[in-house]
Amino acid sequence: MRPGTGAERGGLMVSEMESHPPSQGPGDGERRLSGSSLCSGSWVSADGFLRRRPSMGHPGMHYAPMGMHPMGQRANMPPVPHGMMPQMMPPMGGPPMGQMPGMMSSVMPGMMMSHMSQASMQPALPPGVNSMDVAAGTASGAKSMWTEHKSPDGRTYYYNTETKQSTWEKPDDLKTPAEQLLSKCPWKEYKSDSGKPYYYNSQTKESRWAKPKELEDLEGYQNTIVAGSLITKSNLHAMIKAEESSKQEECTTTSTAPVPTTEIPTTMSTMAAAEAAAAVVAAAAAAAAAAAAANANASTSASNTVSGTVPVVPEPEVTSIVATVVDNENTVTISTEEQAQLTSTPAIQDQSVEVSSNTGEETSKQETVADFTPKKEEEESQPAKKTYTWNTKEEAKQAFKELLKEKRVPSNASWEQAMKMIINDPRYSALAKLSEKKQAFNAYKVQTEKEEKEEARSKYKEAKESFQRFLENHEKMTSTTRYKKAEQMFGEMEVWNAISERDRLEIYEDVLFFLSKKEKEQAKQLRKRNWEALKNILDNMANVTYSTTWSEAQQYLMDNPTFAEDEELQNMDKEDALICFEEHIRALEKEEEEEKQKSLLRERRRQRKNRESFQIFLDELHEHGQLHSMSSWMELYPTISSDIRFTNMLGQPGSTALDLFKFYVEDLKARYHDEKKIIKDILKDKGFVVEVNTTFEDFVAIISSTKRSTTLDAGNIKLAFNSLLEKAEAREREREKEEARKMKRKESAFKSMLKQAAPPIELDAVWEDIRERFVKEPAFEDITLESERKRIFKDFMHVLEHECQHHHSKNKKHSKKSKKHHRKRSRSRSGSDSDDDDSHSKKKRQRSESRSASEHSSSAESERSYKKSKKHKKKSKKRRHKSDSPESDAEREKDKKEKDRESEKDRTRQRSESKHKSPKKKTGKDSGNWDTSGSELSEGELEKRRRTLLEQLDDDQ
């Protein structure tokens, strides 16, 4: 190849892009060169190099894009972005990531497809220097997915036809090379609320009012790039000729593995920038020489090509304004599988790499380098190979993330920008698929952005804390200092300007609140100190007592030297001093009251001790048997009164000696039931039973024979004996009663035997005559004594004789009484019919099987009225017997009226009840005789009952 091939290639791409705009077909990353000067199989790829399609047909033949779908029609008006970035704050993230087409293997053998847009991989370049990548990105044949639009208010926004998203920021695909250089600068320009521009560094999170030098230099480079021309037409023809001369060697090449080459940056010069162009040409010659040396090394190391490892020399990266640094210290280990992919789809890197195994091509490249031979050539030794192994995909992903972290890839970097920083590292190939790399890169960006935000937040928080501490600790700051005054004092300080106005106001208010609280706390401490000092002075003054007044205390304080020397104490609030004195006096009063209480407690304790001593004295009397539950005060008074403990009890309030004695005896009596159980247990164990004839001495001897009797009270033992003796007597009486009942039952059985004798016993019978008839009867055998049998027989005969006499007399009495009652009934009945009619009506009622409900009610009412009239008669008779005075006549008259009223009420009640109870009224004789028949029926029933009662009385007699 001839010198200037790289420049010619770049010029070919740019000029062809200008003369032939990209078609509306699918953007496959490559563009066919349509010109008479181009050879028939030539092809310009997205990386800016002239390539040949293998197995290329006739130049006029066009191949349809493989595996690509046509782009859909774009909407007329895409949506406007939802919001705007705040002017005071820099953008939180980087520009939108450029869309990178996926890596596709070509369908036709040998067809080469570009992996991604070259426009998104622009390196940072010095002023006046442009690379093949910049030119290739500008001349990309693929149609951009971003379109430019205007919002209703005239602002420009950009719409992505593929993702359907819109943004205010210009995407990388639409940026010029100069704009891309500016976008990579960490310094961005923003405007404050007042419209004043300021500059913010997205990496260091620093903001300043003055324009940074880096940004000024890049803006100067942009003006130079716009003014210069990219390449001339002669360079384009030279590159085409170089491609034609190497066409034969490329067609015969079977290996498509890339050989390390160096992309030669070209200079864009204007008529005013001739010196800059000369410098760029010299730099291009040096880079070409380095590429030739690398090609020579690659041709001699055939074993590397066979084993699948090819050393790659990266493109020089510009890191300063005046020089470029070539980083060729890293090697990339490529597997055999990746080599196979590279044959069909070459990987797009920040440096354009091309490998040729043809010896002739190497010779032509060496000749090209010979034309640009520098003054001094240095032999670079082959870099040491370093291989990495990853057992799992997680380890590979982690290694890829560590690579990003090690290279310090910022969170707002795009994928193209990140590739420039990491592609030369062997760990870049840890993940085989591009999607996996992008996924890991996105995860790294999210994590890094989170860490950067957290770091920025912590720094800002630290700045706020420093500002707050500064205000809180400054001696000129008080709770009454105004913000404007503080701004005049501290406005020029860095700590004042480190935070925003809004946060500064909030912190200032918090500081004022803190200072106010602090001042109050100090005043409180001073008040507490004065309080304690005054309290100590009052405590040490012996002449101040609980009865001292405030005026007296003030005079004492003025005479006190400690109070006179303390100025703060003299400036103490008078109200606080008075309150302190009042509390001191209350404390003295409390001490005086406590002393009185203590003396009272001592006196009460002495009285309690006297009572306890007397209680012990009573215990001693009980142990000696002199005091028990049946003791009395009068019996023991001579013994008790002679003891000193009784004398100490005299005259003291509370319980007296007599009260304690009674309580003691009551306690002994309360123990009776428990001790009685113990006594019963002792008797049960001994098998002793208290009988009627048991003496107390025998009982005591049995009880005292066991150890359990030592705690028993003598009085309770006596009471228990009396109780057991009473129970014994009760048992004896019950036994006698039971024997009497048994004897009575036997007598009854014997009498029953005599009464049921067949034939019956005559009244003149003798016991000896009839005895043999009952000898074998059980009732006869139950009574063992013959005298008892004779006695029972005599009693039986006497009863039999009495019953016989009573039976004869009863018949006579019955006839007389019946006549008497018959006469009385005929006289007392008024307004009724004759006795024959009465008996006839009674027989009629008796024969009737059913009576109506009205007849029952009328008979019941008539019976009730009869009883009332009889009752009134008895009352009137009593009154008549009690008194015969004129007052008795008046009472009789009253009774008569009351009787008439009651009889009238009874009649009306009977009529109303008969009306309500009878379902139908009867006509004729029945309805007229209703009440009369009812009254007659009731009188007949009453007479019948009277007769029955009289007969029962006669039978009883």
Curated annotation (Swiss-Prot):
InterPro entries the record matches: FF_domain, FF_domain_sf, Prp40-like, WW_dom, WW_dom_sf
UniProt feature, compositional bias: Polar residues: 337-361
Cross-link (Glycyl lysine isopeptide (Lys-Gly) (interchain with G-Cter in SUMO2)): K191, K241, K375, K376
Residues recorded as bearing N6-acetyllysine in the entry: K196
Bias (Low complexity): 252-262
Residues with the Phosphothreonine modification: T345, T373, T932
A molecular function GO annotation: RNA binding
Coiled coil: none
UniProt KW Nucleus keyword: yes
Pfam hit, one: FF_PRPF40A
Alphabetized UniProt keyword annotations: Acetylation, Cell cycle, Cell division, Isopeptide bond, Methylation, mRNA processing, mRNA splicing, Nucleus, Phosphoprotein, Repeat, Ubl conjugation
Skewed-composition ranges (Basic residues): 807-828, 867-882
Cell compartment(s), UniProt: Nucleus speckle; Nucleus matrix
Domain FF as annotated: residue spans: 393-447, 460-514, 527-587, 607-667, 672-727, 742-799
CDD domains: WW
Modified-residue entries (Phosphoserine), positions: S34, S151, S723, S787, S883, S885, S888, S933, S935, S938
Subunit note: Interacts with the N-terminus of HTT. Interacts with the phosphorylated C-terminal domain of POLR2A. Interacts with AKAP8L, SF1, SRPK1, ENAH, ATBF1 and MECP2. Interacts through the WW domains with formin proline-rich regions and with WASL/N-WASP.
Its biological purpose: Binds to WASL/N-WASP and suppresses its translocation from the nucleus to the cytoplasm, thereby inhibiting its cytoplasmic function. Plays a role in the regulation of cell morphology and cytoskeletal organization. Required in the control of cell shape and migration. May play a role in cytokinesis. May be involved in pre-mRNA splicing.
Entry remark concerning the domains of this protein: The WW domains are essential for localization to nuclear speckles.
Protein family per UniProt: Belongs to the PRPF40 family.
Protein name as annotated: Pre-mRNA-processing factor 40 homolog A
